[in-house]
Amino acid sequence: MDRATFACSTAFFHDYSSSAQGTFSTGHVDFIDKIESFTYSDFFRDYLIPNQPCVFSEKFTDGWGSRRNWVTWGGKPDFDHLLQEFGEAIVPVANCDVKEYNSNPKEQLPFKEYISYWKEYIKNGYRSSRGCLYLKDWHLSRAFPEQDVYTTPVYFSSDWLNEYWDAIAVDDYRFVYMGPKGSWTPFHADVFRSYSWSANICGRKKWLLYPPGQEDYLKDCHGNLPFDVTAPGLQDRSVYPRYNQSQPPVEIVQEAGEIVFIPSGWHHQVYNLEDTISINHNWVNGCNVAIMWCFLQDELAAVQREINEWKDPMDDWHLQCQLIMKSCTGIDYKEFYNFLKVIAENRISILENGLDDEASAKNTPKAAISTLGMLHAVFDLKRTVKVLTSLSANEDFKKLDLTSLSPPQEALLHHLKAAIDTALL
């Protein structure tokens, strides 16, 4: 991050609401063609800060192993190579033809069985008695770390979600998707209202994107979001009373090799127009961590409303709300504190101790922080201070047993502010 971008980002987040998700006044999505003329600061300033979508050309993925090895000369999935590398893996597969609790039910299948199904599905004219099956949310990089699959583009390298979950060795938010023509993902916004990027290794996708706030017009009379935003039933004003106030979606057709950047809080629906393989990351950083925090507060409030009748007779009602929230979203307030702590401590370490040559040569969070520069670390700490201050003042957070937090939030905040002041001297 250069000084001009640091000044721009500091001014933006000082002047605007911490939960601002940006506006989108046109239907045009920028196409980034040339690597050599597009810098990290360009992306940060023009897309991350204002929370706007864009598409990167296939030039940004030309060197990836998956594009060389997973695809035939004709641009189709190379089933033989994939079977050779991953045939015995167990993978999550969704049935696109079945709706279950506003999503598609999943099962675990051997990868070789899924590929056999896919080949038969193509042979039968894209029909099967088993329905349209879509391999989704496969943690391939975690299961096969030795594979030369891809390199995360520098534009997406400030990735707090995967930095934290890698540190605690529990989970990650790096996925591979594989599916036949006609497979699709229902209407949704991404986990924690995170950013996402999605790279097509082969095939084509159609994206329908709705800027933050537009989803409110798509809710039914009970406040529920639709499963499919293209369904004719949305025209029924007795069920969807505000649908006619919604704007048409922003539509993107993504070609092979291209990367789509989906901003924070944008709801979307996605179709595979051909047999398609893609790589996806969900990620959070200093630009959208406040949006994540607002989402968590909204999620907790929804849980509290659901079990409000038990508030008086239940001694540990606030704790139960946190447990339910974590089961639904994957995180609670105390883990969110630990998330902020890990991010903060990694940056404090860089600012206070620098980075030795051996560490910078490795693929580690500290190396990524160093690559983005000291001013980026300061920006991250400033955003962490903002959100951590809000968390510490939150009444629901203060009702929890915080004695297990190490260090206590007051001490962490003091350390953060001191590190920022020293770095800016």
Curated annotation (Swiss-Prot):
InterPro entries per the UniProt record, alphabetical:
Cupin_8, JmjC_dom, JMJD6_ArgDemeth/LysHydrox
- Cellular component aspect of the GO annotation: cytoplasm; nucleus
User: Which GO MF term does the entry hold, naming one?
Assistant: metal ion binding
Domain JmjC stretches: 141-300
Annotated binding of Fe cation, by residue: H188, D190, H268
Give the function comment from the record. Catalyzes the 2-oxoglutarate and iron-dependent C4-lysyl hydroxylation of ETF1 at 'Lys-63' thereby promoting the translational termination efficiency of ETF1.
Question: What protein family does this chain belong to?
Answer: Belongs to the JMJD6 family.
- Keywords of this entry: Cytoplasm, Dioxygenase, Iron, Metal-binding, Oxidoreductase
| Class of this enzyme | oxidoreductase
Membrane keyword on record:
no
**Location of this chain's protein in the cell:** Cytoplasm
What protein does this entry describe?
A: 2-oxoglutarate and iron-dependent oxygenase JMJD4
- What is the taxonomic lineage of the source species? Eukaryota, Metazoa, Chordata, Craniata, Vertebrata
Q: Which reaction does it catalyse?
A: L-lysyl-[protein] + 2-oxoglutarate + O2 = 4-hydroxy-L-lysyl-[protein] + succinate + CO2
- Cofactor dependence: Fe(2+)
Q: Name one Pfam family in it.
A: Cupin_8
Under the heading SUPFAM superfamilies, the entry gives: Clavaminate synthase-like
Q: What is its EC number?
A: 1.14.11.-
Its BP terms in the Gene Ontology are: positive regulation of translational termination; protein hydroxylation
From which organism does this entry originate? Answer: Gallus gallus (Chicken)
Q: What is its main location?
A: cytoplasm
Annotated CDD domains: cupin_RmlC-like (cd02208)
